[in-house]
């Protein structure tokens, strides 16, 4: 049994395999009837998963697909994320590749100063990474009210306008969204937080519905 060694070569032989390794500057060689290659990927170099396993796989005749990040957060271009950093909210994230809906997941979204994170984002990140690697157009769409359809949510917004008459827009989303998120959504479509709820017209209600249900981010 050899431990703490670095394998740098595996050569198929007639009756098995010849394995070359090194340890403390010294090289060695052993043979075996079978080889189990479990080197990991390249996400934990300090633990040995530094990508060298791919070279060993090639020596055995395997073909490799391009390696891209998976189970990761997504960095987004929009500056507004600095405004909502630290907010966690229930939502749905959908990734689009060249305009085609490719994958989606629902759960707790984490908004950071650089973009989006959380389990749902991890689940769809590999599709985004592959699309970016292939130089395709990639964007994500966030739905902050995934339990409601567009028509249903628009009706809710209309009813809130009636109930909250007398307040201002920065109070309109109280009880629905975190204050930071509410402010960012209003800013995104150019509605002032000091505007009276009473002045919220049909067009702006529809815009609010769209931005809450179909928040596009690159």
For every predicted segment, state its role.
Residues 63-66, 75-200:
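An anion/pyrophosphate-binding glycine-rich loop and adjacent beta-alpha core
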Residues 34-80:
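Glycine-rich loop(s) and the adjacent beta-strand/alpha-helix scaffold that form part
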Residues 3-5, 183-218:
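A glycine-rich dinucleotide-binding beta-alpha-beta segment and adjacent secondary-structure elements
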Residues 18, 34, 38-45, 188-196:
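Helix-loop-beta segment of a Rossmann-like dinucleotide-binding subdomain
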Residues 9, 25, 42-45, 118, ...:
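Glycine-rich nucleotide phosphate-binding loop and flanking beta-alpha elements
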Residues 3-16:
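A conserved short coil-to-beta-strand element within the FAD-binding core of flavoproteins
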Residues 19-23, 95:
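Short beta-strand segments that buttress and anchor functional surface loops
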Residues 23-34, 104-107:
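Core beta-strand elements of the Rossmann-like FAD/NAD(P) dinucleotide-binding domain
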């Amino acid at each position: 049994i050899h431990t703490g060694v670095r394998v740098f070569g595996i050569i198929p032989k007639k009756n098995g395999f010849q394995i070359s390794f090194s340890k403390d500057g010294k090289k060695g060689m052993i043979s075996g009837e079978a080889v189990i290659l479990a080197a990991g990927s390249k996400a934990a170099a300090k633990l040995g998963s530094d990508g060298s396993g791919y070279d060993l796989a090639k020596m055995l005749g395997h073909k490799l697909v391009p390696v891209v990040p998976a189970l990761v957060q997504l960095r987004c271009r929009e500056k507004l994320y600095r405004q909502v950093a630290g907010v966690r909210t229930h939502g749905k994230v959908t990734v689009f590749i060249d305009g085609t809906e490719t994958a989606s997941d629902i759960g707790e979204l984490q908004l950071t100063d650089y973009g989006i994170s959380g389990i749902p984002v991890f689940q769809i990140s590999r599709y985004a990474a592959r699309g970016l690697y292939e130089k395709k157009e990639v964007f994500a769409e966030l739905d902050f009210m995934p339990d409601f359809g567009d028509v249903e949510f628009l009706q809710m917004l209309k009813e809130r306008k009636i109930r909250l008459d007398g307040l201002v827009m920065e109070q309109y989303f109280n009880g629905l969204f975190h204050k930071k998120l509410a402010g960012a959504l209003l800013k995104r479509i150019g509605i002032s937080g000091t505007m009276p709820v009473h002045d919220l017209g049909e067009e702006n209600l529809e815009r609010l519905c769209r931005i809450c249900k179909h928040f596009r981010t690159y």
